[in-house]
A protein has these predicted regions:
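Phosphate-coordination loops involved in phosphoryl transfer and adenosine-cofactor binding
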Residues: 6-11, 118-122, 220
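Phosphate/diphosphate ligand-binding glycine-rich loop within oxidoreductases
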Residues: 6-111, 231
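Glycine-rich phosphate/diphosphate-binding loop of Rossmann-like nucleotide-binding domains
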Residues: 16-29, 112-185
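A short helix->loop->beta-strand "cap" motif at the edges of active sites that frequently abuts
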Residues: 87, 145-147, 216-222
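Short hydrophobic/aromatic-enriched beta-strand-loop microsegments
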Residues: 88-93, 168, 246-249
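Rossmann-like adenosine-cofactor binding region
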Residues: 161-238
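Adenosine-phosphate binding glycine-rich loop
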Residues: 220-221, 226-274
Length: 274
């Protein structure tokens, strides 16, 4: 349902990486709040002509938008943008660093099905080394009192990650045995240095989540995945489409979370000014 909360406001989605779920949900979120939403891709911006990111956002700010949503392949890019514009900036994913709104929608999805988050055990499986989703969720989940375990072959585990307070495991079956929630991450081939994995087939032989694995976990263990999904590599088709899977619920909740972010950053200021 469309509401007039942000009528007259302008949101710019500035995405320097491909995106289906995140970009579209930010757009839908803005439009459902009646904001004017402008989408700009890196390929359609003047950065392809040599313009810097800073010059790009300063020029956009000169057009008086109310908020910038930034996704960039470089870690720290949205934080850098905040130093040069006097507008709210939402990090929609920056390199291998963070993806804050994804962790919020993941927590909302889990809470809808588990209630209180405190004490829940979460197993994060997959390409931990290159995953901004893993980093944001480790921080968010621990803040909410959840216990986090990361499961992957050694080359995909960041050195020193134990210092974040997580348990490290290299065996999928053992690692998920006591999990309340299993978060599967895709292998991010676009971010990997060559040679970390011998082959995707070998990875899937040991770390693809299947119904056989789920036969050894609790009946109410939940499966989530931030997408996009590489079917048959990190998760089997039957698990993805099975009753435990909340993958599409996550997508639905992404719109609600991003509407809430826009409202908190823009809507409340309108209410206070009135």
């Amino acid at each position: 349902k469309k509401v007039p909360t942000l009528r007259g406001r302008t949101i710019i989605n500035l995405f320097f990486e491909p995106s289906t779920r995140t970009r579209t949900s930010f757009e839908i979120a803005g439009k459902r709040l009646s904001a004017d939403v402008i989408n700009i891709s890196g390929a359609a911006s003047s950065t392809v002509k040599g313009e810097s990111l800073i010059d790009t956002v300063r020029n956009l700010e000169a057009m008086n938008p109310d908020i910038l949503v930034v996704r960039h392949n470089c870690s720290g890019a949205p934080a850098l943008v905040t130093q040069f514009v006097n507008r709210p900036v939402i990090n929609a994913g920056d390199g291998t660093h963070e993806h804050p709104s994804q962790s919020l929608l993941d927590l909302l999805t889990i809470r809808e099905h588990k209630g209180d988050l405190k004490g829940l055990k979460v197993a994060i499986v997959g390409d931990i080394a290159h995953s901004r989703v893993a980093r944001s969720n480790i921080h968010a989940m621990q803040t909410m009192g959840m216990t986090v375990k990361v499961i992957a072959p050694p080359p995909l585990i960041p050195i020193g990650i134990e210092e974040l307070g997580v348990e490290v495991c290299h065996d999928l079956a053992k690692g998920i045995k006591d999990a309340d929630v299993i978060m599967i991450l895709r292998i991010q081939l676009e971010r990997q240095n060559q040679g970390l994995l011998s082959s995707l087939r070998e990875y899937s032989n040991y770390f693809c989540l299947t119904e056989k694995h789920l036969s050894n976990v609790s009946d109410d263990t939940l499966i989530i995945h931030p997408g996009p999904v590489n079917r048959g590599i990190e998760i089997s088709l039957d698990v993805m489409e099975g009753p435990r899977s909340l993958i599409l619920n996550q997508v639905t909740n992404g719109v609600a979370i991003r509407m809430a972010l826009f409202y908190l950053l823009l809507g409340e200021s309108d209410a206070n000014s009135n």
